[in-house]
Structures are given as C-alpha cells and as structure tokens.
UniProtKB/Swiss-Prot annotation:
Microtubule plus-end tracking protein that promotes the stabilization of dynamic microtubules. Residues 612-644 have a biased composition (Polar residues). Belongs to the CLASP family. One of its GO terms (biological process) is spindle elongation. HEAT repeats lie at residues 168-206, 1266-1304. Residues 360-389 form a coiled coil. GO terms for molecular function: microtubule binding. This is Protein CLASP-1. Keywords: Coiled coil, Cytoplasm, Cytoskeleton, Microtubule, Repeat. GO terms for cellular component: basal cortex; cytoplasmic microtubule; kinetochore; microtubule organizing center; mitotic spindle; spindle microtubule. SUPFAM superfamilies: ARM repeat.
Amino acid sequence: MDTNWLYVLLQKSTADPLERLKLGNVILNEISQRKVSPHPKLVNDFLDVMSGWLTGSNFKVTIIGLEILDAALRTSPEVLASYYFDRLSVLIERMGDAKVQVREMAINLCRQLAYLENSSPVMLLDRLCVHGTGFEHKQWLVKVGSLNILRDFLSDSFALVIPQAINLIPQLCRLTNDPNSEVRDASTNCLVDLMVFGGKSIIAKIANTRILNEQKMATLLQRYESTIATRGDLPPKHSIPIETSSIPRNNLLRRSLRSPAKIIHPSASTTSFTSSARLSTPPRTNAPSLSPSPSTPSPLSLPAANGRSRDLARSSLRAPAGMSLSRYRSSSCAPAAQCAITLDDFKKAFNAVPKISIYSNSDVREKLETANSVLRNANEDWSKRANQLKLIRSVILNSDDSIDQRLLLSLINELADALEFSIRDLRSQIVREAAITCSFLFEHFGMDVRNVAECVLPAALAQVAVSTKIMASSAATLTVFIVQKIQTRQIFQTLFDLSTSKSKEQRRQLANLLETLISSWDLKVKQPILKSISQLVQNAICDADGETRVAGRKAFAKLEQLHGAAADQIFRELDPAKQKMLRDGVSSSSSSLNSDRDNNNQKQPQQPQQNISQKFLSQRSASALDNKSQVLSIAKPQQSNPSRPTAMPVNNRLPKSSTSSSFSAVRSSGYGQSRAKTPSDGFGGTNFNNNNNNNNKSSSSSPSTSTHQTPIQRVASNLGSSSFVASLTQEQASSLQNAMDLAKDEMSKNNEDDEFLLAEVRKTPPKETSPPASLYARGYGNGSNGSNNSSNNSIQSVEHILKACTSSSINEKRDAIISLSQKLLDRNLDSLECKNIGDTLSRLLAEGNTTLIISILETISIFVKCHYKKLDGWLKLALGKLFAKMGADSLPNVKSALSSTQKMFLTTFDPSTQLKEVCDFMCDPVHLLAPKSRLALLEYICLLFEEIWPEDPRCLERQTQLDTPYTRAAVRKMFAWMFDPRIGAILMPACERLVCALFALNAADFTMIFGDLPPECRDWAYRILQLNGQQQSAQRQQIMEKEAITMTNNNYKPCPPEVEKFEKVSVKASFSTYEATRVPEPQDYRKPTVHLAKNHVEQAAYIRNQMDLMRDFQKPDRVNEAMANLHGMMCEGSFTLWNQFFDELLDEIYQILSTLSQSIRKKLAMRILQKMCTAQATKLFDSTEIAISKVLQCACTSEDNTMSVAAEDCLRILATHLPLPRIVQISRRILSQDDDDQRGVLILKMLTRMFQDIDVDELHMIVDDVAPCFVSAYDSTSSSVRKCAVFGLVALVQRVGMPRLETHLRKLNATKLNLIDLYVGRAKSSESGTSSN
C-alpha cells in the first residue's frame, strides 16, 4: 500500500489551506481517472482526510473535498459506498453550511449515494431519521436539505419510501410549526407531495395525527386540490392503502439485499423514469438453442408450466447472415430488430386468454378489484399474478354492450399503479404479461387510458436497459404501442428526458421511437414540440453508439419526408462528416427519397476516388460548379447503371418534367444545403433562352423508360409517387406543381452553403489550380451580369472571410483578419454584415490569442471608425470584451493598442450612448469581471465625465442630465464593489475620481442620486469632495501664477473658459483615499511631473533628490515615496535622462531588493526594474544574471505571499527583453545546482511564459537546451515543481510539436507521457472550442 498513488498523495496533506487546495487539485485529477484500491486502511485514511477537509473553516477546501468525494464515488462506487454511509454524518452537517454551493454539493452527493449498488433511498432516509440529525437537526438549513431529499425520493422512488414517509408524517407536521419560515415551507411542500402521490389514504393519515390545526389543514387541502387541478388529466397515481404498505417495503428491502441494485441516480441530467429503474437484475441464464422453424408456436399462447424455458428460448436472437453470434448477442433488443417479443407476438397474445362470463357491472368491478389487489401484492405467487393479467384482457374482451364503459374505464385507470408495479417486476413472465396487457389496453381504448400509459412508460423504458432479452424486448415493444396510440405532451416529455440517459440501450430505443412518433402522431400535436423533436433527432445522429446513430438517421429520413424545414435546420447545424454520413444513411434507409437519387445515380456513373465535397456535389447540377459543365452535359451521352437494382419495375417508372426533376434533385440531395441558380433549373439569366433551358434539362436527366405516359401520371410523377399524389386530379396536381415551382424559385437563390461548398471546390480543383485571389474576383452565378457578380462577390467574400476568422489555424486566421480590415474600408456594408462582423470580432477579442491581439484591435478600430452608426447594438458587448482584455496582464505594446482602441470608442460613439451602455453592462449580473477589469470600466466612465478630448463637440457637457435609472444603478454597483474587502483597495482611487467627476459635471443631479443612497455612502462621498476641495485651495494661487498646466496622465485637459478651468482643476487635480480621511493632518500627494520631460535641469535635480531619499533605508516611508515618484515619472514618460542615471538607479534597485527590511515595498522596486528593462533593455545585457538572481532572492526571502506573483511578472519581462542565450544558460544553471523548490518553480514558470511569447524559430533553437531541464524537473519530489514541469512540456509540445521533443521525452515512463498527452489534448480541445464559438 505504501506505493499506492493515493497513499502517497494523502501523506502530503497538511493543515495549510493553500497546500490543501494544491493537493486537492492533484487528487481530483488522479481520482477522476483511476479507481480507488479496496484496501480498508487506505479507504479509511482517504475518508478521514476528506472528512477533515469538510469540517474545516475554509469553504474552498470544503468544495474541493466534496468534488473529490463525488469523483471517487463515480469511479469506484462498489468500493466506497459502504464507507460513505459510515461517514454520512459529515455530509449531513455540510448540508447546513453557510455557502450555497457547499450545501448543494452535499445534497447532490447524498442523492447519488442513495442510488448506488447495495444501497437505496430507504437506507439514506433511515440515517436522516436518527435522533439529532436530518429532520431533527438543530441547524435549520440541514432540515431544509433533508426535506428536499425526501421530496426527491417521493417523486422518483415513491414505492420504496412510502412506508418511511408515512412514519415521518408526525415529524413533518411538527416541522410546519418550526420557528424558521423556510423549514415550514419545505415541510408543507413535502406534505403536499405526499398527499398528491399517496391519495386520500395519506390525507386521512395526516388528519388523524391532529397535530395540524384546522387552518393549516385547510391550506394543505387547498394546495392539494390546486396541484391536482393544474395537472389536468393526471390524478394521483400512487394511492397505496396504508394497511398493506409494510409488505411491499419488506419485500423490496429483501430484494435490495439479495442482489446488487441497478437503480440509476436521478441527477439534474437524468430523468424520472431512469431513477425508478428496477431494483435488481437476475443473473444470466444460458438459453437453449433456438429452433429456426417458423412453425414454432408463440409462447404467449402456451400454458405456463414450462413458460420459463420457452421464454428463454424466445429471448435468444437469431443472428443475421454474415454476423457472428457472439457479437449479435451483445446488442440490445429493439422493436424493429429480431428480438424475443415483437409487435406481431403481442397482437397474437391479445386474445390468448381464458374464457369467462360477465353478467353485470358489479361482476366487472369485483374481478378488476381482485386483480388490482393481487398485482399489488409482491409476495403473491407469480403464476397467480400472471393469470390476473390475462384476466384483465379477458374481462375487456368478454364485456358486452350492457357493461357501463365509463365504469370500465375508471376501473382500468385505477390499475395504473398495479400495472406499473408489474412492469418493474423481476420475473420475465410477469413483465411480459404486463406489457401485453398494457399494449392491449392501449390498442383497445386508445387515449381513454392515457393515464395508464403515462404511468407505465417510465417503468417500461427503465426495463429496456436490462440484460434479460425477454424483459427488454417486451418493454421495448410496449413503448412502441404507447407512442403509437397515446399522443400527449406528457408522453413526449418522458421521451425527451430519456435523451440524457447513460444507457445506450435506452437512447437506441428512443431513436426508434422517434421514427414512430414522427410518422404516427397528429400534426396538431407535433407542431408545438417540433423543435424538441428535431433536437432529439440531432442528438441521436450525433450519439456515441453506432446503432443509435443508424436509428437516428432513419428518424431523420422520416422527419425530412414530413417536415422538410426542420430537417434542413438539423442538416445545417451538423459538421461535414455527419452530413456525409447522414446522406449515406438516408439514401439507404428512406424509401421516400430513393426515387430521385436512384435516377440521378443511374444517369451518371460514379467517378473513382472522389473526395467528400465532390461526392456531395455529385448530386447537384454540374453547371453550379463550372461554366463549362453545360457543354459537357450536352456532349456527354446518356448512360444508366444496369447493375443497380430498382425499387419498381422499369415499365412503372414515370417520366419527370424538367422543372420538377431539378427541384426534387435539389430537395433530396442537400437536405437544406445549397440551392443555386443553375441553367438546368431554367434560371440562368439572359444568356439562356427557353430553348436552351429545355435542351439543358433534357440533357441533364435520363430519358424515360416508361411506355405508358398519361398527363395525370406525368404530373403525379413530378410530385412523387405517394398515394396522396396519385389521388389528385389533373387540376389539383397542376396547382400543386405551380406552387412547388414558386418554392423552387425561392430555394434556388445563393446562400451561405453555396459559398462554403463551392469555395472548397475552387480551392482544390481536381486537375487545374487557380490563384487564391480568384476567390474574391469570380462570381458564383453562371448567367448573371457584371453588377450581380460584383454584388454577390462582395457579400460572399465577407462571409468567407468571417468563416476563415474562426479557423483553428493561426496563419489562416491572421490572413483573414488582414482581409477583413481591408474589407471594412468599404462603408457600404449593410447592417446584417456589420452585425456578423461585430460578433466575429468580439469572439476573436475574447479568445486571448497573444499573437493576433494587436491585429484584432487595429481591425476593431477600423470597424468602429467606418461603421459606428450601425453598431449601437454591438457597443455593449464590445466594451465588455475590451474591459475584460484591459484587465488581463499584457505586454506594453498590447496595452498601447488597447488604449488606442479605447480612445477610438470614446471619440467615435455618442458619449450619452456610451454612458448608458457601460452602466447597463456594469449592472448586468451575467457579466462577472475581474478586479482589474472593473477598474478599467470605472476609469472609462471617468473619461466620459472628464472630457478628455474637449475638441470633440459631442463630449458630455456641463449640466448634462445624469439622474437616470441606469446611472443610479451604476453608482450603487460602484459602492458595492468599493466596500468589497477583497477588491476595495484596488478600486478606491477610481471610485473617488468618479465621484468628483460626477459632482463637477452636474452637482444638482449628483445631489439627487446620492440623496437616495445609504448614509455611509453619502458621508463618504461628501468627505471625499470636502477633502479634495481643501487640498486644492492651497494650490489655486500657484495655478493662477502659471500660464498653462498640462495634465499628461491622460486624465485631464483644461477647457478654454477661465472660470471652468479653475472649477475643474479644483476638483480633478488629485484624489485622496478613504484612509486619508482618518488622519488629522493632510498628507502630501504626488504631483505630476510631465513638465519635467523637456526641462532637463529640473528633471535631473528632481531625480537626484528622489535617489538620495532612496538611500536612506532607516526611513522606509521616504524610500517608498521616492520609488513611487520615480515609478510615476516612468509611467508618465517624463523620465528621459536614462544615460545619466540608469546605472546609479539600477544599483539602488539591487540594494533595495537585497535588503531584509519588510517595510520597504520591494514589489514597487520590481516594477521599476520592469520599466527600466522595457525602456533600456540593452543596458541590462551585462547584468542579466544579477537581475534574475536579485529577483529570485527577493521572492524567496520575503514573508509576503503575493511577492511571488510580482516576481513572476518581473521575470517574464526580463526573459522576453534580455538575450535569449543568457536566459537559457542562467536557467539551466539554477535548475541543475539549486535545491530550492521555490526558485525552481519561478524559473520554470518564467521559461513557460517565455515559450508562449517568443517566435517559433527562436524556440526551435533552444529546445535541446531547455527540454532536458523540464524532463529532469518532472522527476522532482516537489509536487509544485512537477506541476510546473508538466505545464512547460505541454507549452513546448504545443509550439514545436511532439516529434521535435520525442528524443527528450523517451526518458519518461508511460504514465507521465499519458499525462502530458492528456493536457495537450485538453489544450487543443479548449482552443478549438473557443475558435468555433
């Protein structure tokens, strides 16, 4: 056990929450892919550690612990289920956690635990009923969670938990008097559900407790009646007598202990019927050999003496020719296959019942009530129950007209629960007889017994997944009868919930039922749910199971035949591979579509070695691909394929007119794909007259081989060969033909699919190549004039460029962005194109591709500049993406591009519109911004208020109305952010600045807005304004003496009017912080130094003064202030004397990084070092090793936990600006000689980030030097070092490819290589998913 992976990881568990989070992520990744060893000590140690995590005070550790327990339960349920029950009290306690996420995860884990093998909801409820826990816990949240679990069990497993629920009625009634309102509501809901499911007997039981007063009882009855009324035709289904409830429970408990349970966990994605699957599955029995004789009588009509052996004989499958018997036995039964029970067998068994005599209504009532009581009793002999099922059919068959039909139907509807219980039985004879009886009821009464159908359908679908063929096939056949005869919304909802089942047999049966539903249901019933039907068909086509996909393609063929528009929509949403498979599947399975395709296939022989696009386009008119195809089609002789079998005799094949022939070809070959204007359709343009059209049509279609041609037959053949068309008269057929011609005209227009498919053909022609520029210079219509060509070319070029922008290839995406920026210069783009372009640019901006971000930002600037009048609806989304990007760490050139793009937005759009959109985005709860992104948003609003570019006449003017609902909401949101202890310190300066700017812009509206805020917000705002005014009063005299002051921090520019100038400066010159208001004496604030950029004398004196202050380590405050002033100069661009002060300043920075004082802000020194490296990188070449060593020393010796983050940023700047060979040499020496894990982690992270930033050619040069370092680091004993090594190797594989690193990765074992492959696959899948979106 000492070498077990889980044991090794558990030994690293500590009390530090940060270490627990790191270790938890490693355990979660491993335990999601590996099974837990069944060693008792290991499992107990694992659960002890997790219990400690769950009972800790850090909720993040609790969440990761619950995720680990959930993943372990999914991978190793047979090992951990019993151990979890021993520690169930910990989960129950977590149900009362203060965090909603922790409570929900604990409740879901308890639900999952109840539906595992050797477990049941009964066992979990027993634990919740223990005194002091669950329903009697002192924490009200635990009570609410326990009540919610009980409600779920009542809904999903009523038959199992009804005895316990009845015993809990007094406790539930007492909880309705709980002091907490949520507990009272939850207990009331449980009682209402229990009344609905249990019926009048449960209502009487609740009333007999006499715990509830009359008012509460009346309220419960009222809610019960309203619930029944809202369910329409769904009366309570589970009215089980109380006096017999203990017998089924004991029996069910005995069954659950006798064999492993097969109950499926009812999660949010599973359905109600899967959760109520059968409790256990009997072992497989070797079936005798099946006799191939068709004269074998059906076992349904034989006596029950040897029914078991005959059932097993019937349950064997006859393997088709060419298929191995073992393989065929592994597939599940479907009603359409050769299963143990088929539709014909059911219909034959309908009348195979004993003869009885029915004399009166009371006789019918007596017999059916007897059958109901026998079927409900699980301890009754199975043969008696089977006879009672036959008796039900016999009663119906032998009832004459004197029997009251309403009485008969009411008695049959009362059998719903008994029949459902029989369908779930463990004996195949009972399941078969119950399925036959239910099918007989649906066949005989139809919609009158829909309640029975809705009750037994979940049970039947659950039985489809069992391994016993006779039971699975009986249930599958029953579902076919239900779907055929019962057409209600509840039936479809049950089927829709089955789409998320994990059982491939159930999903396969659903696909088969979809075909039946589409073909048999009435149009009025299907119309409201047609979109959901299409979704199910699409899910079946894309299913992981091959047989399910085949059934899904058959359902698609039926859907295309009856609802073409829905089928076209499905086809357009599928990828090309699925489309090709769908075409092949439909053409081979749909008889309604074979006629046109058979004709097309017989007209032209198949060309060898065609690619996918050519095979797809072979169904289309050749003139849609090439202008020369018309001549080729005329010159080519007519051929037919004599070897292809025909669906009907040759003399029955009717001729088709040219118009309908082309229409049907387009309609059946593409399924919603391109319908282009072709000369063969008669819409070529002015270059083709009617005679040419007729010639083309006759040349592109095979001559008719029929000798019997009548006008009515000719018209009918144009429309198809169905019975409906054959019944039309000449006038009706002609009218229908005209309507179809008009529809064909609309469908023959070019669309996106034409552009996509034809562009692919032009890219890779079979014999000759064309330059890429022809893609934009050629038109796609064959007979259109020049103007049409240019118009279509412009539209389709934009669409093609946008599709290329979503490519996963970086080079193709880069070329598409360049083409798009050129296309955007055309100001004639319509609104739809602008909308598509805006959506594409938003997705590109959100991808986070560092290599293309500058090109994307430049393209967005051009787009905004040229088409801003059409982009009001896109402004909110674009600003949100821009704020998110500005909040991320990026290189200086990227920040400059972001600033330029932001300025383009500010100077182009109307300021009032910008303010409204930004405020709406700020208050939208859907958008969750990072702290730095929130800071960028607040600064953007400040820029709108402060008139950064007063030369723009559209800027916000003074006295602009700001008292609007969206401004009020934004101010409240700002205070919510500011008072957040996690991010308030970051946002405080921007909030102060925003308050001052708002007051300066419109003081009256400022007073109205802040008058409705809480007192603490008003006091803070007024204090900021007062303090700001006091600070500025001392500076007004200096401002008046100077002729002009330019605020160069891109935050202020004074307006020409002198009075306004003083008003603005008095408010905007500088801002304090909230902490400054608590200091009695005002502090000195840093003054802008932009005016020193050109005055070298004053600049040198200022820098010398600050550097003298930096040398006084005895006064850390002065050192920090001096560093802040110098850093501010560098940010403002006023530090220009690099040659004079660079070496001296670098020496001071090194000394600060080396000092052991914790009062000096070393992170600020690192930022200064970054600025120096960015501005004068060549001066640091000689001291590269010293700079890296100082940063590493500072990060490793500091007590600040955030110092490592600043060190990572500094090392990344150094690595990307200093000589690459020196960086690699220093890194190798540190990794090989230094044993400090923290230094190794920082170096590995620096190299990993460098891999992502440098060019591929440079990376290829250093791969052989750095790859061995990462491979050796992968063997480190420190998990953090190994993690960084894995990430570095993954980054290398992504950039240079696996073959380039193959020689270095040979040293790793298979497990480590698999982990690298796993992370590389995840990175590629996430990248492709982002690009596709």
